Curated annotation (Swiss-Prot):
Active site: D267
Catalysis performed (reactions): D-glycero-beta-D-manno-heptose 7-phosphate + ATP = D-glycero-beta-D-manno-heptose 1,7-bisphosphate + ADP + H(+); D-glycero-beta-D-manno-heptose 1-phosphate + ATP + H(+) = ADP-D-glycero-beta-D-manno-heptose + diphosphate
Binding-site residues for ATP, renumbered to this chain: N198, K199, K200, E201
Stretches the record annotates as Ribokinase: 1-322
Gene: hldE
GO biological process, one term: ADP-L-glycero-beta-D-manno-heptose biosynthetic process
Protein name: Bifunctional protein HldE
Length: 482
């Protein structure tokens, strides 16, 4: 469905690195020293937490990951660095701050119930020496990566100055910047590509109580305007992800079947979004991918990750609303032009036609066209333009039915109709990387070729055409009545 298994984008995660330390035990007595439980420890282990969990999710998706953060000069910091490096993470931008401990959260669990949490951390902002050292070294990796994730847990690393520097420099290089925000003042995230607040965080940041669709749209648009975001979205828990534009909301519904534990789901969402966007997906496809990844994760216990194989298996075993997905691929020209702003890193393939009676020749042609890039857009003649081109008896199938048939093909990403006799104006607006036409255009002028980077002609399968099918049906009728 997504075709991202072979992708391996370079992604930098800058944020608050943590260790989640779990202690499992039993309790059968009270301490004689004080009225408290005595825990007999049976097992304990360390897991990656905070921004490290984002890293873990990216590694599971086969991204090339760089991490920038601060650890203390302690055993926990050594373990964290060694663990990340063993996973293939580039830790060249991991800095040691002797004035602070490595953030470590210890959870004591008895009979599957958390009874105590102990935090070792410092929320003090990093000192100027560490700050300057980070800025000095970050230029090189910011130039190299496709995307930056800012994972802010409010532990002192991401002060206003450092956050502004990362966003401003990255945007000057046309890099994607995704932020998992913290607190109620989002001004330091101004200029980011997108933020991933949940509904409660969006309320806190905007001062808007979200109680219905209108207030949700107001909050989403407020975030977009105030933070000058390219894309505004709010994660909606069991309702999915809301994307906001032009005072409207588009909700990508959740894919979760069963929820066992929501721990780390937000980290999975931002990791999956960054992976998909960096790999050429548009925001709608990226949110769909993130929803599936999150559905896999919440079906597990504890902080977990989702691999490509798990995502594919989940899709194939879920009775999803296929009709809704198909219909979402049929879009207006206005919506398409908005989408194209988010597809700058994708190789766009465009073709067009009437596609009146879909047949094996069409399927072969469209599959070959899709293989030429990342996104295949099919321009579809409306009914009136077909009548002008083919005669008053055509089309056989209406525009709506033809569009649904095309959208039902896995190789087709978007279907957009046009009313003119040729798709010239549409091609001029899209400016595709690849313009595809049928092999019968060898001796014809390809309309709109001057607006495409490349023109590719694909031969049709001999003997397979809509005209042949119609003629065959007509001959059959004549024979039947003679």
């Amino acid at each position: 469905m997504f075709g991202l298994e072979s992708k391996s984008p370079k992604i930098l995660v800058i944020g608050d690195l943590m260790i989640d330390h779990y202690v499992w035990g039993s309790c059968e007595r009270i301490s004689p020293e004080a009225p408290v439980q005595v825990v007999d420890v049976k097992d304990e282990n360390n897991r990656l937490g905070g921004a490290c969990n984002v890293v873990h999710n990216l590694i599971a998706l086969n991204a090339q990951v760089f991490v920038c953060g601060v650890v203390g000069n302690d055993e926990a910091g050594f373990w964290l660095g060694e663990k990340l490096e063993s996973m293939g993470v580039d830790i060249s931008y991991l800095f040691v701050d002797t004035s602070r401990p490595t953030t470590k959260k210890t959870r004591v669990i008895i009979a599957n119930q958390q009874v105590l949490r102990v935090d070792r951390e410092s929320k003090t902002p990093i000192d100027s020496h560490i700050h300057n050292n980070i800025v000095q070294h970050l230029h090189a990796v910011l130039d190299e990566v496709d995307c930056i994730i800012i994972s802010d847990y409010g532990k002192g690393l991401l002060n206003d100055e450092l956050t502004h520097f990362v966003i401003d420099y990255a945007k000057s290089k046309s890099k994607l910047v995704l932020c998992d925000p913290k607190g109620k003042d989002y001004s330091k995230y101004t200029g980011a590509t997108l933020l991933t607040p949940n509904k409660k965080e969006a309320e806190l940041a905007t001062g808007i109580t979200i109680c219905d669709k209108d207030s949700l749209i107001k909050a989403g648009m407020t975030l977009k305007t105030q933070c000058q975001l390219d894309i505004s979205l709010i994660t909606l828990s069991e309702d999915g992800i809301g994307i906001f534009d032009n005072n409207q909301i588009h909700i990508i519904p959740t894919r979760a079947k069963e929820v066992y534990d929501v721990t780390g789901a937000g980290d999975t969402v931002i990791a999956a979004l960054s992976f998909a966007l960096s790999s050429g997906c548009d925001i709608f496809q990226a949110c769909e991918f993130a929803n599936v990844a999150a559905a896999v994760v919440v079906g597990k216990v504890g902080s977990a990750v989702a691999t490509h194989s798990e995502i594919l298996q989940y899709i194939h075993t879920q009775p999803s609303n296929l009709q809704q997905y198909i219909e979402s691929k049929i879009i207006s020209q206005e919506s398409l032009f908005t989408l194209l702003k988010d597809l700058k890193q994708s190789k766009i393939v465009f073709t067009n036609g009437c596609f009146d009676i879909l047949h094996i020749g069409h399927l072969s042609y469209l599959n070959k066209a899709r293989d030429l890039g990342d996104i295949l857009i099919v321009g579809l003649n409306d009914d009136d333009s077909i009548k002008r081109l083919k005669g008053k008896e055509r089309p056989i199938n209406t525009l709506h039915n033809r569009a649904l048939m095309l959208a039902g093909l896995e190789c087709v990403d978007y279907v957009v109709s046009f009313c003119q006799d040729t798709p010239l104006e549409l091609i001029k607006a899209i400016k595709p990387d690849v313009l595809v036409k049928g092999g019968d255009y060898h001796n014809k002028e390809v309309v709109g070729k001057e607006y495409a980077k490349e023109v590719v002609l694909i031969d049709f399968i001999e003997g397979h055409s809509t005209s042949n099918i119609i003629e065959s049906i007509q001959r059959s009728k004549i024979c039947k009545h003679s």
